[in-house]
Amino acid sequence: MFSYRHAFHAGNHADVLKHTVLLAVLRHMTQKEAALNVFDTHAGAGLYRLDGDYAKTSAEAADGFLKLVATQPKEPYAPALKDYIDMVAGFNTTNHWSVYPGSPFIIQSLLSGRDKLKLWEMHPTDIKTLTSNIAQLEAGRQVAILREDGFE
């Protein structure tokens, strides 16, 4: 098994793009009354510390999310990008930017009571962390976590 740990890469430039698009798509999809079933095939731990050892080891967030929020744009941010920054800000009590939500937390924060979220993760440590993190949401049966290959 390839042992990918997203905690080393949380908040990098790819996350900025991926999570901005994810948030915009989900905002659009949740405008309808129909229930959603959302799948995350590589959920990781779901929530990350940008001031933690893993993030500091790679320092990828410094060139991604942290660089974005440290920059004073000449023009206002595009609405989708502003929405993304505001979403991450909602997980932090100050502008210290220590907590970074992964896709599972971004998705779950937008779901209604009729929607479902299914998360797959194979890394033994990350699935334990993911399970603990998701338990804090008290989402009950709305969120299912599977220790399986999300592509199978």
Task: Tell me what each language-model feature is.
Residues 39-41:
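Conserved beta-strand/loop positions that form the S-adenosyl-L-methionine
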